[in-house]
Amino acid sequence: SKLANHLSPEDRQLLEEHTDMVRQFERELKKSKADDAHPTPTLEEGIVEQNEQMPKISRMQTELLVSAFQADFTRVATLQFTNSVGQASMTWLGIQERQHTLSHKPNSDTDAQEKLTKINAWYASEIAHLAQRLAETPEPGGSGSMLDHTTILWTNELGEGNSHSHKDIPWAFIGSGLGFKGGQMVDAGGVPHNRLLLSIAHGMGLTNLSQFGNPDFCSDGPIQGLS
């Protein structure tokens, strides 16, 4: 108030508006703290980004993701395991060779194929764990579980590692968030994945979109029969 007495009417008005904004921000912070009823995940300390810690890091990232959804900090998240040329060794599965090296072995190499199957089964178990965590977490402010209102999209950037083929890339959808029908396998007949991404956009309510990425691959619209 002392400062306001030395200001012009115009500057006094600006000061009052700024003060009101700060007070409103304080009220929102207090309300946010009062509404903060979601549990904070308990994460093990001292976990560093090392190959052997990958299983623990996976579970920790999953807990952070579920907690972020539960608190409505975000509604979209990406969970990525290694990268396209990742050199992880799944030693906890008894496999010493690096996954990327194994992925370039020919299909006739039965030992490599068995190990890759074991590795992919581990990835699947981590996605299943994410789905289970969402399924056992009630939807905040709604009905059912968070999985009922979420869709997990699990995919890979290649259809086959040793040839770097982009054909027959697998896409798995888990959950009911987009309204897609579950419990089915769909052979899309080799159509560009742009059309699937367009289907996802439509499932999120963006039905005004007619293309996703290169328009040359979207002329036939979204893939039919998913919902």
Predicted regions and their residues:
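Ligand-binding pockets and gating/stacking loops
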Residues: 1-227
